[in-house]
């Protein structure tokens, strides 16, 4: 305790003590692996059969190989296509449901129940979800049997042998898994809007569509930016669903191979140097997008002030 301006200022050491477990966990599981990954990215270190090659310092050679390789650009394109296919229907569905559930004038009943149901898919493990869809859309699965019974197709459609249907299933699964979380976020933002604005618009004769596009959407901008950026970061880390659904092959013709699946293949083949370089690149992209969130949010706060 020390005196400042005639007043006693007391410092509570227990606050710092309670931070120790968090700091230890962060250093052991976050900081040390990050530094190790960056270090390994500058070395040639892989297994050739049963022979260990390296570690040999190669500088930026691993990064050069990644950027000059045609594979990484194809996998980056696959990742972005899958994210766009998932995010567009997800954001539209979430905005629609959020507007419905937050609109007091509709007087909807059972909103708590439906909010719970909407969020439930978010609690299901991706592996379970993938196995469910794999069973449903298998050659002899229920979906093919139903389509043949109603005469829509004459023979089983191989969903996982066509680029469009494989990507569509991956996007559909991710959309179903995450739209509940997005809906809750947008709904919270809508409920935080001053109701007097809606009342004034109603008195002025504005329609529901005009209110949504002129009042709700502009005031939701900070949350929408957050949702877009976090969804993009999650899209860059897409792994479990396509990995399980395609058995790690990314087929057909590697059209569903994502960057993280490519990273996993490098790690599985014990190519630690290239894996480290790819991890660093993904980390930089994620960091840039995270900074963009705070910058855009900060600009919005300044405008309000």
Model-based region annotation:
Residues 1-2:
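N-terminal Lys/Arg-rich, disordered targeting/topogenic segments
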Residues 8-305:
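A structural signal for multi-pass alpha-helical bundles of membrane permease subunits
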